[in-house]
């Protein structure tokens, strides 16, 4: 087996480098040939994956967090939308949400899945907005959760506290907004707080945003939170870790294959934890689009 490993050395608060070194040694012991490329700037792995997806590889391995997966998959799609080679996942980020839906709990789990060589097909989501098009493997959101992520990024020097700061600031200025959306031909209007479009169950590590989502069912799960008080919002957030937020009267859950969303004003998007584009958007599921080791 000959693999290309694309590594974010800064993933998981700089754990990526150590995980890469450990992985390379484990592959060597199994007689698996691996060429490793370290990311040296945002977007670097997009460029490498786009170029190498047509290369003589038995697979491309993404080593990092959900954001690393986002770069690698979009690079592969850019280089060849047919995605001729499978993707391997070696989680080394702070969240690693998607890897949990593959059944990965430890580095050893991930390594064995890749070394075994067996693959399965899973879905991707595709998003088109005014200025960009991209695919996502985990989740696409906008509204409160995305606003918090954007605000937290500006406080990243505070480490893990940055999200607490983001929640506090965005909650203080909480405002609902008009949302118009259509799912598989059904038109709906709401006074909204956030929308999360999920391919997999989890986000942000162990937050079970879409408890019923499956990565190979040909559907996307849409969870929306409608207008509520600040206090009610703060009580809702812990419920997401248990997946019980769907029982709240302000929460609605939909599934679909094709959907569009329009907000006033435009809202920033966070695909797989990254920041890219704004509403309005059109989103489609790409059933069985990519092969993954596992």
For each predicted feature, which ranges?
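ATP/NTP phosphate-donor binding region
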Residues: 1-60, 186
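Gly/Ser/Thr-rich active-site loops/lids in small-molecule metabolic enzymes
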Residues: 156-162, 206, 211-232
